Structures are given as C-alpha cells and as structure tokens.
Amino acid sequence: MSNLNPCMTCGACCAFFRVSFYWAEADDAGGTIPARLTEQISPFHRCMSGTNQKNPRCIALAGTPGKNACCTIYKNRSSTCREFAMSGENGVVNEACNRARAKYGLTPL
C-alpha cells in the first residue's frame, strides 16, 4: 500500500483556484517559476496562466484532476502552491481542498 498523500495525484486545487503570487517569484525576476507560464495581474502580482478565468486550470497541471494529475513544475511551484496544505497531512483537513474536490465529484479527504 502506498503512503503517498492522495493530493500528490489529485490536482483538483490546480483546476479550481486562481494561483497568484508576488511577481518576483518568476524566473525573469530572479525566482524559479517559468515566466512564460504566468500572466501579470497587477504591478506586483502574477498568476499561473489559465487560473485567472471563470473555470481555472493551471497551465502546469498535467492529467485529469482526481485521477492522474501532476504538476509539471512541482520543484519550481509558487509560494501559493507550497503553502496550500495537503489535506490530511498531520491529521489536519484542508476545507479548501475539499471544496475543489467536490467540483470534480470527489470525496473529501
């Protein structure tokens, strides 16, 4: 049996929320996020392309949410993604995760 947290292959949050972050996290400003995958939303903030729309889906998300999804830039992901807690980690439920999962007909974690 795998000890892998289900969040690692879910991706529902990546196709539910706008992923915005401080502009300097992009690689053209010294950060690690590929700037070509972002769009500017204010003088000081960017977001991942695809997430600033009515039905968001991060451009870095590969696969199908809830089934076989993965982040193609996981090691270089934004602080927003790094700070989004995996549901169930250390026994703590992430209600935002459960809202995203509900959109895809997935059970809460």
Curated annotation (Swiss-Prot):
A Pfam family annotated for this UniProt entry: CxxCxxCC
InterPro entries: Puta_zinc/iron-chelating_dom (IPR005358)
Protein family according to the UniProt entry: To A.calcoaceticus putative ferredoxin.
The entry's keywords: Electron transport, Iron, Iron-sulfur, Metal-binding, Transport
Organism ancestry: Bacteria, Pseudomonadati, Pseudomonadota, Gammaproteobacteria, Enterobacterales
Organism: Escherichia coli (strain K12)
Taxonomy, superkingdom: Bacteria
Protein name: Uncharacterized protein YkgJ
Keyword Electron transport belongs to the record: yes
GO molecular function: iron-sulfur cluster binding; metal ion binding
